[in-house]
């Protein structure tokens, strides 16, 4: 399925603020949550609805609610945590399934070190969140894990994506929809997205930042 780059004016504006080299941890964290919420709006537009009846102030009223599968949000640790509150602000009833993936800085290969999945994940729509889709290794490893656990419907939301990472994910899992605020130019020799956001995890948690 093709990757969707969401070019909404609010998203473009907020993403531009996030690219500043001198952005504070507080502002970066708040913007990551806000863009995460806006991406959630786009990624859930096709959820099915069903009609039911309630007692309104003027009598019986027909209203709608989301039908079908329940949702689990899957932050890829650690940086994915930075988008979590924004997503949950729109779908507060969603379960959270955390996945820890580490990348070898020399080989750029990803390995999973933690998985805490919703027990009924095979009955849920999984929304993976991670600020960066760089090489694609962490995303593929997470999708592999979810599918092994029985999850049949998976979508991914990232703030910025590199064409190389998109290609890797689409080749490995063509059934997974990817929603991103920006498809950036490329990866550099260190596997960082250009122009990117820098090290999103460091900026969210206030730890040492790397040039990227």
UniProtKB/Swiss-Prot annotation:
The EC number(s) this enzyme carries: 2.4.2.9
Gene3D superfamilies: 3.40.50.2020
Keywords from the UniProt entry: Allosteric enzyme, Glycosyltransferase, GTP-binding, Magnesium, Nucleotide-binding, Transferase
Cofactor annotation remark: Binds 1 Mg(2+) ion per subunit. The magnesium is bound as Mg-PRPP.
Enzyme class, spelled out: transferase
Reported cofactor(s): Mg(2+)
Gene Ontology BP annotations: UMP salvage; uracil salvage
Activity regulation summary: Allosterically activated by GTP.
Gene Ontology molecular function, alphabetical: GTP binding; magnesium ion binding; uracil phosphoribosyltransferase activity
Tagged with keyword Magnesium: yes
Binding positions (5-phospho-alpha-D-ribose 1-diphosphate): 78, 103, 130-138, 199
Residues reported in the UniProt entry to bind uracil: 193, 198-200
Metabolic or biological pathway, per its Swiss-Prot or TrEMBL entry: Pyrimidine metabolism; UMP biosynthesis via salvage pathway; UMP from uracil: step 1/1
Domain of life: Bacteria
Reactions accelerated catalytically: UMP + diphosphate = 5-phospho-alpha-D-ribose 1-diphosphate + uracil
Family: Belongs to the UPRTase family.
Function description: Catalyzes the conversion of uracil and 5-phospho-alpha-D-ribose 1-diphosphate (PRPP) to UMP and diphosphate.
Protein name: Uracil phosphoribosyltransferase
Source organism per UniProt: Pseudomonas putida (strain ATCC 47054 / DSM 6125 / CFBP 8728 / NCIMB 11950 / KT2440)
């Amino acid at each position: 399925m093709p990757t969707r780059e969401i070019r909404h004016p609010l998203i473009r504006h907020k993403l531009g603020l996030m690219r500043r080299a001198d952005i504070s941890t507080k502002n970066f964290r708040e913007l990551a949550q806000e863009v995460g919420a806006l991406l959630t709006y786009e990624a859930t537009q096709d959820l099915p609805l069903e009609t039911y009846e309630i007692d309104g102030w003027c009598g019986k009223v027909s209203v709608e609610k989301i039908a079908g599968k329940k949702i689990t949000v899957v932050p890829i640790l650690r940086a994915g945590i930075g988008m979590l509150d924004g997503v949950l602000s729109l779908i507060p009833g969603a379960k959270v399934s955390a996945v820890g993936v580490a990348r070898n800085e020399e080989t750029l290969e990803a390995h999973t070190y933690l998985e805490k999945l919703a027990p009924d994940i095979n009955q849920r729509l999984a929304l993976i969140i991670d600020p960066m889709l760089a090489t694609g290794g962490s995303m593929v490893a997470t999708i592999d894990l979810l599918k092994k656990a029985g999850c049949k419907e998976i979508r991914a939301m990232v703030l910025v994506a590199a064409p190389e990472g998109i290609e890797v994910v689409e080749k490995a899992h063509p059934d997974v929809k990817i929603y991103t605020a920006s498809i950036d130019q490329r990866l550099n020799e260190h596997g960082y997205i250009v122009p990117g956001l820098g090290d999103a995890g460091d900026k969210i948690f206030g730890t040492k930042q790397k040039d990227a």
